[in-house]
């Protein structure tokens, strides 16, 4: 009985575990794993193919080669199980033990483990505080190291050369010991007293002041403490016993012809064993030192190669000149264990085939070829045949299926009914790349796919292939049906818009059906309803496009779900009335009573989903598709060459343009314009010509003259096939039609610059050779780009998934009061994104009040749905504070309230939803649509004039934000602050426009003034920065000496003089320390004070400033004292597209970032150095902060000006790290979200902000401790934010002082590698480094994220696995109290019963 129980236990040895710990293995531990020592390098006998004894494949050590049979054949069969044969020493058991029994090699001399030696930073080096060079010299027998100084004046760890060693030996004899090789290092490591070292370093940390020293000490202290805490011993980094991998994991297979295919590891092990045995023999023979040393060095090198080939020196190569694959290579990289076998496995019950269209399928169906279905569902068919008694055994059933008897097909039908299958199309860029369908059996060999899901799969039918997978268990079928069925995935998880949207033919059909035609047959009929309209159409009494009056009954769905009907006569067309028949009840007729393009149809489906729910929408979508196909066929729309009408105006336009170009060419030759101007002007001419031709062509195509019923001429939209395709959004665009019938226009070179000779021909006329050649030039680059883009985009997605994989919704509400403030997205005069669009699906974090009152409109913690958004719009609320993932307070993952609505489902997100992965997929999936290029600002773009005024685009009133200003003598306001903004607000208080106001702008309107559209509100000089006086008085020059600090020029024409301040570097010696300034004095020559301060009004002038005033001139408030010319922006390349998104998420610092003020205070300038300026900020408390700024940077601040922390001192692209440090988390979140959205918006891709916020949350995972308090942390160390939060909570509860910290922003790659989980980090990148670090510090992985759980083969803690994990946690908490006695007895009884009732062997 006991044996039976033990046997059963041995069969199911998957103990449940909750964490994985990694550490260093001690020699005893390695011996305890081992089943015997491998003594010989032999593998198998080449004649008998039996493993050699004591060799690498030895059956005595590793187990039998055949199941339950010893090597010599004395014991066979199950009955001898567990017997050890006395002849060959092999245990009789299953052969699969050869997969997990390890051996070992006793090394004749210790060997350093290369990972801890060479993986930077070297752990051995750091621990012993010795340079890596020195350690290597000792290990490879070049120098001696003192291990025991004894009574001599040597020091422990001192390096000695051969000569020095011999000298010392003569001097002191055996007073001291010095050794070389790994033994020496081992002795040094073993003799270290780690706790004492740690103590000493802590004391040193408190006393030392040097920053570099502190950094070094902190690093070393952390390592030492990790060793102490984990129970690892430092000497274990030196190997004395080498474990041997089980033989079935490094197989050796005989090929025919007497050759063998073998794993590289066998070669590497053979080398080690050979050298080890030779070393043993040499030691026994007491060979000369030099020979032994050489052998030991070779042993070290061969062990290095086995563990990590190529890490040190040249890689050992096999017979084919390729480096051998070592143990480290087995686990790292795309082909390594992690990514090849653990994160992505191939599965059975799957098939793949080409896809074709299934236009007659329902949305939840797919067509599956019978042949394929038969193969996939074989086991189900066998079992059915058996239970029905149609086949006696499985073998018989197999025969029946192979013969394909008639009954088999009937059973296949039954088996398949309501058994969903999964269809997947590679690349699976987001979760809609795998969906479930019910299979319908079809003839042929191609899978049929429903046209409406093509958008989600990004599939077309030009030879795409798809894979089919069969969910086997009931749970899997249930999940496939409830969660993955195509009918349950109508909305896109990225934006919440419908993704089941008709395209191409369907759109064209519906568009054709809903167009109107003047004077069509049957115009003016009165019809009793859609049915009669259809009858009229079918009997040919009325055309599809005829304008008629029809009696329509609308059903209105009310808030409470009640339905009421309303009937009225509506002016419409026959086609629209017929379409109304398929529209579900509850939608208004106005949605159909228009010409339906792609946008309108999408809107129609969206409305249906929001108002009527899932089921009606799905049925409706199918009906739309069938109708669309039917009428596209009836329309007879086709592409004919005569449909491309070339406008007559084209030739005259081109002739005019050529004339203009000729003129500019002449001007250039006579030197009136520069080469650059000529190029830009030529390009502008051709671009505008192209536009004019295109406009003429579109006007020509889009309308035609017809005679209406009154016999008059009337214009109507044309029924030109090509125009209809483009107008409906089915295929093609205005830009493409322009190339067909207008002119092709300007072409780009591969570097993005524009070729100045345009292609004047179009495709209808045909291109000549030159034109064809020009057009291939840029087009080829496009193709190359696309190939690169795909790889880049895939890599971005991989990094995003990796950083965000463990963000799961873990609780309903974290209880935080924090949130982010949402305002509409306004650029210049346009509202780009409305507030309601941004806030939809978010949870309000504080009560929204009715503007101007204290009445609560929306209470906090309300989920904003479409209904509430209407309330926000109607009350013209301008900003809302909503909860955000970034500010969520959950320790792990985030909470449902902070995330808000699940976009793909339309309600509050469920607990267990893997929102991190969804966010990563939503950002990564459109990556292939983004451009790869860096835009060169060339051609038309660079000539745009710099802005110098603000014109209102809407009526409303002016509002100024954080603006300081003075009023000048004309009564105009002059701005004297930096970061001012001007907004224009409509009568409801909604922000319509937002503009930046530069320093020195003149406003013609004051705060609160009314403004009309088109009025100029503010203006300023574009290329200079003024210095504005805030007081009136008389000018007095200080330190402004002509020829020393300033140079005066007098204009010959006007006679006016101006002085330009010379830069400090260019002045003669006398003027170096002078500081030119303009002081304002009153009539008696006394200093005028700046209002509100006791500082005299003195304005220091930077270099290059130009002063147009004379000494003693009178000035008024708001006058310009001096002007500083601004360098124009120049042609800076803008990084756009995919690289820009990657830069943002990697949090890369820009080349020349904007310089932001570190503190609030008053600015002054100190002594300058050769290339830098010294900027001093005096804080209100009186202490100063200095910063050196390169001279070539243009500063935005003057001496004596007050600035706030985070203000821009020098312009440039802002660095996200600075934004976080100086303006906080909200600012950096907004910055990254807006910048990323900018790129996607250009491509017309919609992504919800919350996905970007989820990634930003993960980038902010770490923080740096600034003050340790009573915590365990060290100041300056970087710790997981959640760790600090939990630790501080504890400290506060105990009444101790919590640690203080600053949040850090990490790029996504860094953040992925810095996760808590070493398994996840190791499977991402830099596997060796991650594992080395984890092993040394004895890390424990709690398997919190998704990736770790996939790798160890458990259910993931998300989705349906979330409940399972919650359960386990609750159980564990219970178990810590311990089970009761009764429970224990029950458990035992259950075990025994299980043992008896089992029908296992």
From Swiss-Prot:
Protein name as annotated: DNA-directed RNA polymerase subunit beta'
Key words, A-Z: DNA-directed RNA polymerase, Magnesium, Metal-binding, Nucleotidyltransferase, Transcription, Transferase, Zinc
Entry note: cofactor: Binds 1 Mg(2+) ion per subunit. Binds 2 Zn(2+) ions per subunit.
Region of interest: Disordered: 1368-1387
One GO CC annotation: DNA-directed RNA polymerase complex
Function: DNA-dependent RNA polymerase catalyzes the transcription of DNA into RNA using the four ribonucleoside triphosphates as substrates.
Xref: Pfam families: RNA_pol_Rpb1_1 (PF04997), RNA_pol_Rpb1_2 (PF00623), RNA_pol_Rpb1_3 (PF04983), RNA_pol_Rpb1_4 (PF05000), RNA_pol_Rpb1_5 (PF04998)
Comp. bias intervals (Polar residues): 1375-1386
Enzyme Commission designation: 2.7.7.6
Residues engaged in binding Zn(2+) 2: 814, 888, 895, 898
Family named by the database record: Belongs to the RNA polymerase beta' chain family.
Residues annotated to bind Mg(2+): 460, 462, 464
Cofactor: Mg(2+); Zn(2+)
Known catalytic reactions: RNA(n) + a ribonucleoside 5'-triphosphate = RNA(n+1) + diphosphate
Higher taxonomy: Bacteria, Pseudomonadati, Pseudomonadota, Gammaproteobacteria, Vibrionales
Biological process per Gene Ontology, one example term: DNA-templated transcription
Assembly notes: The RNAP catalytic core consists of 2 alpha, 1 beta, 1 beta' and 1 omega subunit. When a sigma factor is associated with the core the holoenzyme is formed, which can initiate transcription.
Uppermost EC category: transferase
Superkingdom classification of source: Bacteria
Gene Ontology MF, one: magnesium ion binding
Positions with a binding annotation for Zn(2+) 1: 70, 72, 85, 88
